[in-house]
């Protein structure tokens, strides 16, 4: 009931051949999703990953990670704190087909918390790469502590981005320096430098 109509951003583009089939499919899919309380999670995740790689839309991607972390973290996970936040972020970014996430990438200036290394050998038209500096504050930490971690993350991300090893790895993409600060399981800072 679908026809292949070309390619778009390394994906096969499928179209519905006519209006009658379109209405039948749409009604069937919508009814099925409502009856079974299903979500579009894998589709949305793929769309967010594509937006990150091709359009530089980083904020929705990290908001998605924060939402998943908040939704799926158990009490035991919350007790692990920083280790859980870092591990969860790495696990989600590892599912992104356009990047190889490198945790604590060594640069001449220290260790980048998370470097999203673009897979340019496979996806030649990716135009964005990312350094993510993650910071964690305990749930009871003050706003002053959050600001201190934010400034520390800015300093580190700027330093790492200028290193020779990072510059070689990102060519020819545009490097985004992202800082993320969590207070407990809540993302309180997410900004680009």
Language-model features: where?
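Domain-level recognition of nuclease-like catalytic cores that cleave nucleotide substrates
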Residues: 165-193
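Extended alpha-helical interface modules used as scaffolds for assembling large macromolecular complexes
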Residues: 1-155, 159-161, 191-193
């Amino acid at each position: 009931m679908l026809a292949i109509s070309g390619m778009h951003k390394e994906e096969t583009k499928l179209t519905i051949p006519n209006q009658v089939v379109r209405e039948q499919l749409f009604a069937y899919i919508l009814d099925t999703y409502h009856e079974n309380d299903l979500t579009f999670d894998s589709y949305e995740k793929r769309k967010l990953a594509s937006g990150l790689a091709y359009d530089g839309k980083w904020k929705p991607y990290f908001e998605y990670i924060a939402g998943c972390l908040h939704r799926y973290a158990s009490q035991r996970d919350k007790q692990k704190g920083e280790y859980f936040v870092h591990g969860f972020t790495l696990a989600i970014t590892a599912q992104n087909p356009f990047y190889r996430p490198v945790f604590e990438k060594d640069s001449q200036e220290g260790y980048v918390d998370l470097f999203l290394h673009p897979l340019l050998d496979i996806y030649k038209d990716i135009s964005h790469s990312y350094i993510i500096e993650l910071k964690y504050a305990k749930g009871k930490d003050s706003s002053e502590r959050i600001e201190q971690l934010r400034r520390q993350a800015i300093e580190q991300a700027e330093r790492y981005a200028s290193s020779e090893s990072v510059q070689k790895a990102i060519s020819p993409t545009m490097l985004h320096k992202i800082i993320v600060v969590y207070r407990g399981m809540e993302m309180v800072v997410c900004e680009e430098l």
